[in-house]
């Protein structure tokens, strides 16, 4: 798993370049890489296979990013469930677990489509089963060769992939993951310097349709609740599309492309404890990637209280502050709008407060901007008024970037 995760992480940027499905927001590589990084950071290794896999699944479900990251997490969760209480696995048991895990990934998606990461998961596990009697290293090598063909064929499964002459980014990400596993089986090397980004096939510049439409907000919510996955799938369906719902223990992770994430949040708060949330403006992401007005991009935080129309017109990225209302953390102007805030002000049990964005949120925003632009200008209030400025500086320094960044 570690080797697979590291091999996927080093290919983050290449995956972003070919990301056009389900929307051309150019962040599939980043979302998968962040999911893998969190697994490496939070999962605990144990001598027993079931304990290790359970820890990996928990970290994945609770910290997955994006559509493909959520599907990947549910696949790992299914793998942990299928391993069950086994402390060690035979080759046959491993192959059976990988095959049975696929159904968990499919069931998490409200409208599963072929030609995506799901297809590669299914075909890879089927190929393992068909050649299960072979030596393990040979088995993996053969299955990966067939997985490559499956990935290549994704461009003929979905029109948007065919139109842009690219394979599905999520499917390619899963291929990098299983290639990393094979590298470790073959060499036994886990050192990070061993993993190199693959050479990507040159493509004519991808210019996809960048009109995202009304469902422009890629939204994720982690909810602690006793209610089951099916309940939340039915509850969330009216709010948007690209719905993925996964559950492990008492935690439900929800991914949805929504028009009004604040309404999704208001609904979920009534159903359990919302542990965390993430909202990305896919229209802005698509514009910055494919229709950027300037080589310089501007980033600020939601203290800069200017109209949304102005931010959209000038393609300004606004990092939301955290608003804490009755012990629940909201994203300023995204999962908590000013209209909703003031309408319910008299209903709050405690005085609302604010907090800086987390380091993980800052890293995610800055990584995407730095990748897309030639230069980045960050405009924030003074460090004496808010700690966000100093946190931004620390985050930029930790990224070791070579591009020009002005704060």
Where do the language-model regions lie?
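N-terminal loops that bind phosphate or other acidic moieties
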Residues: 1-407
């Amino acid at each position: 798993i570690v080797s697979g995760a590291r091999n996927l992480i080093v290919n983050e940027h290449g995956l972003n370049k070919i990301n056009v499905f389900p929307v051309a927001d150019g962040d599939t590589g980043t979302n998968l890489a962040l999911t893998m990084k969190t697994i490496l950071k939070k999962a605990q290794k144990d001598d027993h296979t079931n304990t290790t896999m359970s820890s990996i699944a928990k970290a994945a479900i609770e910290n997955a990013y994006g559509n493909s990251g959520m599907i990947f997490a549910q696949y790992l969760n299914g793998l942990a469930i299928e391993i069950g209480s086994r402390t060690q696995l035979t080759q046959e048991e491993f192959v059976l677990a990988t095959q049975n895990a696929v159904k968990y990934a499919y069931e998490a998606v409200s409208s599963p489509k072929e030609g995506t990461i799901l297809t590669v998961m299914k075909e890879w596990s089927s190929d393992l089963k068909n050649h299960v009697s072979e030596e393990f290293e040979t088995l993996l090598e053969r299955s990966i060769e067939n997985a490559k063909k499956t990935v290549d064929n994704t461009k003929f499964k979905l029109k948007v992939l065919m139109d842009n002459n690219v394979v599905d980014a999520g499917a390619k990400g899963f291929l990098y993951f299983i290639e990393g596993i094979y590298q470790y089986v073959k060499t036994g090397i886990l050192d990070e310097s061993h993993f190199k980004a693959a050479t990507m096939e040159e493509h004519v510049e991808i210019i996809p349709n960048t009109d995202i439409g009304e469902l422009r907000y890629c939204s994720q919510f982690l909810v602690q609740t006793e209610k089951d996955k099916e309940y939340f799938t039915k509850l969330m369906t009216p709010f948007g599309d690209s719905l993925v719902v996964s559950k492990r223990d008492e935690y439900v992770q929800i991914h949805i492309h929504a028009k009004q994430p604040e309404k999704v949040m208001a609904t979920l708060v009534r159903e359990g404890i919302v542990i965390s949330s993430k909202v990305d403006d896919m229209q802005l992401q698509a514009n910055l990637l494919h229709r950027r007005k300037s080589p310089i991009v501007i980033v600020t935080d939601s203290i800069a209280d200017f109209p949304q129309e102005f931010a959209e017109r000038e393609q300004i990225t606004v990092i939301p502050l955290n608003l804490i209302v009755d012990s629940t953390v909201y994203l300023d102007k995204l999962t908590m709008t000013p209209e909703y805030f003031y309408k319910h002000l008299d209903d709050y049990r405690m005085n609302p407060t604010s907090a800086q964005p987390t380091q993980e949120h800052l890293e995610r925003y800055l990584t995407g901007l730095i990748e897309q632009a030639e230069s980045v200008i960050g405009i924030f209030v003074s460090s004496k008024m808010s700690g966000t400025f100093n946190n931004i500086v620390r985050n930029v320094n930790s990224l070791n970037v070579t591009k020009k960044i002005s704060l």
